[in-house]
Amino acid sequence: TKMISVAVCDEPAGKYEFYGYVKYSDGIAIGKKNEPFQFDPGIFMDDDGKLYLYTGFALAGNPILLDGSKPTEHGPMCFELDPSDMLTVLNGPSYIGVAGEKESIGTPYEGHSFLEASSMRKFNGTYYFIYSTMNSHELCYATSDSPVKGFQYGGILVSNGDVGLEGVPDVKHARCNTGNTHGSIIELNGKYFVFYHRHSNRKQSSRQAMAEEIRFEDGKFYQAEMTSCGLNGGPLEGKGSYPS
């Protein structure tokens, strides 16, 4: 778990085969040079053909998961990879400006510092870094005009307890059981959707995939409300039968 592996396949649904470890030019795998724990990798290819890897995990109180590694104290790490093999590091690691917990104090990131689940998107020339915060139940975003630096906190995208919406100031008032979440944003036919997961049966191991349309105006995303019908355009009619 200290390294990042790559698997390849000719079809997106599999069957995948091991391809190699992401490595430095000297052949040593990332994670083997005493870097912070490599976790939840996200890949982004920019319009100019440059390829970036984002990774990181900030929770110090999980010794089993960390397995002797150290958590990141400075937010997510970025590596530029060689697009010809998608394995070899050209530049990095570097930190992109999304604050860790200690660094967030007194900044817009305070209360929403980086935990895990790195994902990069680009809309209308602006880079949007999407991540799960130390609150765990929410996805937030930060923006920059560069994929490798200068990210400023943007806001909450979604919470699997609707924490942050009107009347839901904190987890104690959450509309349902909360837990960690991972996800990202997709633009489809001019509309934007946030994909994430919630937890059913009050168990962290029972993760249910979710999606909501999200409002996007003047470069800003506004927190989406969690529903069960995010891709249906509204509630189901309650007629007939529906697949689970």
Report residues per predicted region.
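Carbohydrate-active catalytic/glycan-binding domains of CAZyme proteins
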Residues: 1-244
